[in-house]
From Swiss-Prot:
GO biological process, one term: tRNA threonylcarbamoyladenosine modification
Stated name of the protein: tRNA N6-adenosine threonylcarbamoyltransferase
Binding annotation for substrate: 135-139, 168, 181, 185, 274
Annotated compartments: Cytoplasm
EC class name: transferase
Gene: tsaD
GO MF assignments: iron ion binding; N(6)-L-threonylcarbamoyladenine synthase activity
Keywords: Acyltransferase, Cytoplasm, Iron, Metal-binding, Transferase, tRNA processing
Length: 334
């Protein structure tokens, strides 16, 4: 039995969790900063870092209390050390280093993107390797071939804006509240996704990269020409914009799966909480015999520490250890 405490502070959530054997979350605590950043329309790095300083130890204490596991029952401390906002990452890294030293436990640094890729192992029915992983968030839109824990190969990524960024910037153009992706998803449920024709948000050719800047520009031109609509017309605009983003993600992911002969697709990252993306990916998988799609529960799509504990557990079992010189790496590539 392996029990790992993990800390996650890469952006605007302060999170801690205790996970057993990389499969069972004994606790999973998240302190969100949405209300703090809402007035600014997005995450303010300095405010995020300051709030992490205030919240990190209370969140860790709550995670330990909920799990019923004390420091003596832990096998290691894992922490997100990149990528992310450098100031935010440093808070979590310093806290984890201090706790590991005080408790005499091994320390493991975890890549945030790997955490997303393995979050599905906390679900009731986990995937099996190998699988194709689509990580979609505010800062990343990437396709990975996952052959085992710690064994990933980048297949394609966005050349400009991430899908989550396209949602958030689009929401700002429409005057919608932060977080923008959630607002668009909510309004789109009442709209017609075919009401407005947006350009395909894909890169031409056979490669597996993404591009969303043109789609965002198309929305800007539409708003400049027609203004921001209200009521049903706004719902139609949100649904059409969302559909263009989702279509690009699903088409690229399934193109990669067919070409590389993957039978399993795992959706991960905050945008994987989008209801239309979840439905579209599930529907597309049903069209292909032998193809399965794995989508974690919504709470495991957004930033959390349980997924970091899963990755940390398997890194620990591989013999990986971080020293006292572990530092934040905001540009750490998986």
């Amino acid at each position: 039995m392996t029990r790992v405490l993990a800390i996650e502070t890469s952006c605007d959530e302060t999170a801690a969790a205790v996970v057993e054997d990389g499969r069972r979350a004994l606790s999973d605590v998240v302190s969100t900063q949405i209300d703090i950043h809402r007035r600014w329309g997005g995450v303010v790095p300095e405010l995020a870092s300051r709030n992490h300083v205030v919240q990190v130890m209370p969140v860790v204490d709550e995670a330990l209390t909920r799990s019923g596991v004390g420091p003596e029952g832990l096998d290691a401390v894992a922490v997100t050390s990149g990528p992310g906002l450098v100031g935010a990452l440093l808070v979590g890294v310093q806290a984890a280093k201090a706790l590991a030293l005080a408790w005499g436990k091994p320390l493991v640094g975890v890549n945030h993107l790997e955490g997303h890729l393995v979050a599905a192992f906390l679900a009731e029915v986990p995937p099996a390797f190998p699988y194709l992983g689509l990580v979609v968030s505010g800062g990343h839109t990437s396709l990975y071939a996952a052959h085992g824990f710690g064994d990933y190969r980048l297949l394609g990524q966005t050349r400009d804006d991430a899908a989550g960024e396209a949602f958030d910037k689009g929401a700002k153009l429409l005057g919608l509240p932060y977080p923008g992706g959630v607002a668009i998803d909510r309004l789109a449920k009442e709209g017609d996704p075919a009401a407005i024709r947006f350009p395909k948000a894909i890169v031409k050719g056979a490669d597996l990269d993404f591009s969303f800047s043109g789609l965002k520009t198309a929305l800007l031109h539409h708003v400049k020409k027609h203004g921001v609509p209200e009521g049903p017309a706004l719902a139609d605009l949100c649904a059409s914009y969302q559909e263009a983003i989702v279509r690009a993600l699903v088409e690229k992911a399934f193109r990669a799966a067919r070409r590389l002969q993957f039978e399993r697709l795992v959706l991960a990252g905050g945008v994987a909480a989008n209801s239309r993306l979840r439905a579209a990916a599930t529907a597309r998988a049903a069209e292909y015999e032998g193809m399965s799609v794995f989508i974690p529960p919504v709470r495991l799509c957004t930033d959390n520490a349980a997924m970091i504990a899963v990755a940390g557990t398997h890194a620990l079992l591989r013999g990986e250890r971080a020293g006292p010189d572990l530092n934040a790496d905001p540009a750490w590539r998986l």
